[in-house]
Amino acid sequence: MGIADFLAQKKTAQAKANLEAGQTFLANNAQKEGVVSLPSGLQYEVIHMGDGPKPTLHHKVTCHYHGTLIDGTVFDSSVQRQQPASFPLSAVIKGWTEALQLMPIGSKWRLFIPPQLGYGDRQVGSHIGPNSTLVFEVELISFT
């Protein structure tokens, strides 16, 4: 077995382990009070509900966010950088696209994103492994 085969086997094993851990996490999380589960598999918890308008797919949104894995490992945080992020809503992972269209401006929600609405079976950076379930706290500041 060559190095490429070894790395492929390692990625497959990690993807399987991440998928199983995420499925268990989401099943348990769905039972928690205040957690809403959508047909897509997306789950969310409202930390604060804003009262402004909601963005659509064609808007550019400005948000603060803090992203972790289910074990609490932080992989990205505009909060830690002290700089909100702006991006087209159509250019982010499916879980964000779905959730943010439900959020009024001024809202802060915790999102629980299964792999099929996140990065799927791709390795992203050094922290997000294949089939990772992602957790984000997202505050919708504005949109244009």
Each model region followed by its residue ranges:
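Cross-family detector of peptidyl-prolyl cis-trans isomerase
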Residues: 1-144
